[in-house]
Amino acid sequence: MDKIPCTVSILTRNSATTLARCLESVKEFSDVLISDGGSTDATLEIARRFGARVIRQDPRFLSGEGRIEDYAAVRDQALGEAKEAWFFFLDSDEYVSTELVAEIRCITSSKPAGVFILYRKYVLQDGRVVDCSTTYPNPSMRLFARAAVKGFRKRIHEVIVPKEGVVPQSVKGDLYVPLDGDIEFWRTKRDRYIALEVKRLTSGTRAFWPLIIKVLFRHAAISAHYALRHIRILLFCRGVKMPFAHEIERHRYHLRLVVALWRARHECSTS
């Protein structure tokens, strides 16, 4: 069977524990591009074993420790290195369902240039797929024709920007997000996002009080929305539920972001 005419872009940094699973799920794609941030484990060896191309993340978009500070810029860098007209991006700890692979094959071979929304599902460490989570249906624009987009935006939680007049469509099949590691792993990961978000929010000349009030109300509303969804899940979900510790972490993220922003203002005023 012919390869799927689509570039798959994967960000890596010491991703040896999850990369093989990810690459195995996209082995039917014609162009697999690894954007690496200076891995020192077996990441690059695994990439070569699967025949993936490797580029180094531009140091302009990284911190002094080599971690990404501008995800949109790193994604744009990979987009510029793509060989195919279609582009699909994911993280090294994610993997693709066979149904989604078949759907992407159909889209890239028969559909006009467009942008497509995929749906992510969490997978527990015992292999069970989570049926009910407060973030479901968890949509994400991950597949697109390069001619249909402007590029990426947002330094964290990056998103692709379609060109004017391009209406995103939905895709069948799931993108799996394993809940590997303990809760501290996810807490550390989110704390990094908090630090980047605070840096972004405080880098301009906006007045502090309107900023923190806006952030406080926005994240309080999001947290309340998740809480209501969680109550509904507890009452009506008969399938596999997202672990409670992970649901609580979402509320912790929003609270810690506001606290970190307040502390950043205090540090600036006393320095």
Regions found by a protein language model. Give the residues of each.
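Catalytic-site signature of metal-activated, phosphate-bearing donor transferases
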Residues: 72-79, 98-267
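Extreme N-terminal starter segment of soluble prokaryotic enzymes
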Residues: 2-7
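Active-site-proximal specificity loops/subdomain of glycosyltransferases
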Residues: 49-83
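Conserved beta-strand segments of alpha/beta enzyme cores
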Residues: 31, 53, 165-167
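Short aromatic/hydrophobic "clamp" motif used to bind/position activated sugar donors
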Residues: 87
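Short, well-formed alpha-helical segments that are part of the catalytic scaffolds
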Residues: 10-28, 33
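A conserved acidic beta->alpha catalytic loop
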Residues: 25, 36-46, 50, 59-60, ...
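Aromatic, loop-rich ligand-recognition surfaces of beta-strand-rich domains
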Residues: 94
